[in-house]
């Protein structure tokens, strides 16, 4: 088992280094100009070249032209709207569905205030935020998968 040595903030040498701005990384290099002039352009150019290479090597396929006289049986939204679509589809009262959608960001806004007494960065030491995140992710995936299924089996995903 390893023991992590915590810095002694009463040490005058360490305090002098921190006062000079040398505490942001192990080597004591300042962010300007090292990171901003050399590392960031390399990362940006690398990202742009990867995106350009993918666009050239695997262009997007053009689908069949739209027919305004043929309506599909069920019109589905884009994939990122599947959980919201499923929520509105399964709740009988549409006002309740809209209120449930508004409750999601309202609930997420309350989590920092609930966890404000806890200063830890480790997610396992912040049980409320971790639990809210995990339950929200599972519910969003469940609703998203259910939106692609017929309405009668959409909540159970055909499992029960």
Swiss-Prot record:
GO terms for cellular component: chloroplast thylakoid membrane. This is Cytochrome b6-f complex subunit 4. PANTHER family: CYTOCHROME B. Keywords: Chloroplast, Electron transport, Membrane, Photosynthesis, Plastid, Thylakoid, Transmembrane, Transmembrane helix, Transport. The gene is petD. The lineage of its organism: Eukaryota, Viridiplantae, Chlorophyta, Nephroselmidophyceae, Nephroselmidales. Its main location: plastid. It is a multi-pass membrane protein. The keyword Transmembrane helix applies.
């Amino acid at each position: 088992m390893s023991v992590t040595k915590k810095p002694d903030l009463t040490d005058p040498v360490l305090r002098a280094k921190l006062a000079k701005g040398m505490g942001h990384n192990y080597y004591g290099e300042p962010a300007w100009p090292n990171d901003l002039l050399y590392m960031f352009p390399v990362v940006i150019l690398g990202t742009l070249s990867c995106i350009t290479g993918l666009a050239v090597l695997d262009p997007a396929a053009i689908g069949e032209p739209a027919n305004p006289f043929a309506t599909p049986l069920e019109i589905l939204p884009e994939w990122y709207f599947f959980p919201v679509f499923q929520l509105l589809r399964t709740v009988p009262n549409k006002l309740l569905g809209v209120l449930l959608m508004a409750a999601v960001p309202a609930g997420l806004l309350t989590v920092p205030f609930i966890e404000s007494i806890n200063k830890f960065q480790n997610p396992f030491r912040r049980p409320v935020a971790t639990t809210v995140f995990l339950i929200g992710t599972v519910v969003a995936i469940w609703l998203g998968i259910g939106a692609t299924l017929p309405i009668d089996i959409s909540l159970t995903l055909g499992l029960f």
